[in-house]
Design a protein with these regions (language model features):
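Active-site microenvironment for binding and transforming phosphate-containing groups
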Residues: 1-283
Length: 283
């Protein structure tokens, strides 16, 4: 089983963190031997539960029959963030978790959306956030840092962040409504989008035919638009006060690396979920 870690976060001896990958599990769907860690409609619940046990053992948070509690969410692409100090009897609804309690694993699921881990290295507090385009537009990560400041007295100057595997600007095509939403929220929104005109073999072969004004009823070539979700979240972290060198955004693109990662878009909606997890080691 392969895990992805942030080199920067790995330097903190009291911190446990990881982003899971696609292989090394028992799920027969999603290509087989899949480490699907989300209760998706295509997989058996028992397989997911077994995958989670294998994952926790790999993280070395299992001792005998006891393991660290794993706290997850029913994610709804929101800006709802929960501060937890123990497992909840009911599945919490939202897209962010924060804690300063040792011996708990907090986690978010993803399969193109970004799993983001934020760590206060001085006060030993942590947060995990699920940032798709909707959550990013709602400033989930920015608000998460704010919640850590409120609950734990965290100072962004003492914080580190790791943006985990997610779909990147090379592959993340979006519609005009997404750009409109971002432009209503961020002054720098234009820098987050890349436009690409679709190719037209006829135009490319006979360019002189298209030098004159286009005939009535004929439109310009359609434009594809791509969003840099990683940069959008990196900018939010910078705006909260984190130093540029404190943000690790080196994780791979899920859509480009479907052999090792789950991608909702790349797998056409039939895929598993990875986890971004963090925990504080007990003294």
């Amino acid at each position: 089983m392969k895990l992805i870690e942030s080199r920067q976060l790995a330097k903190l001896p009291w911190l446990m963190h990881a982003f899971s990958t696609r292989g090394g599990g028992v799920s027969r769907v999603y290509g087989g031997n899949a480490l699907n860690l989300g209760f998706t409609k295509h997989d058996f619940r028992g397989a997911v539960e077994r995958n989670r046990v294998l994952f926790l053992k790999t993280l070395d948070v299992v001792s005998g029959r006891k393991s660290w509690p794993l706290i997850t969410l029913r994610q709804i692409h929101s800006d709802l963030i929960h501060c937890v100090d123990r497992p909840s009897e009911k599945l919490l609804v939202g897209d962010g978790l924060i804690t300063n309690t040792p011996g708990l694993l907090i986690a978010v699921q993803a399969a193109d959306c970004l799993p983001v881990i934020v760590v206060d290295r001085k006060r030993r507090a942590i947060g995990v956030f699920h940032a798709g385009w909707r959550g990013t537009a709602k400033r989930i990560v920015e608000k998460g840092v704010g919640e850590m400041r409120k609950h734990f007295g965290s100072d962004p100057r003492n914080m580190l962040a790791a943006i985990g595997p997610g779909i990147q600007s090379c592959c993340y095509e979006v519609g005009g409504e997404v750009r409109t939403k971002f432009e209503s929220q961020f002054a720098y929104a234009a820098s987050l989008f890349r436009e690409l005109k679709e190719s037209d073999p006829v135009r490319e072969k006979y360019p002189l035919l298209f030098l004159t004004a286009r005939a009535p009823g004929h439109s310009e070539l359609p434009v594809k638009m791509f969003l840099d979700l990683v940069e959008a979240n990196r900018r939010q972290l910078l705006d909260t006060g984190l130093a540029e060198k404190s943000i690790d955004a080196s994780a791979p693109c899920t859509s480009c690396n479907r052999d090792i990662l789950f991608s909702f878009r790349g797998d056409k909606g039939v895929t598993g979920r990875l986890l971004g997890v963090a925990g504080i080691r007990p003294n």
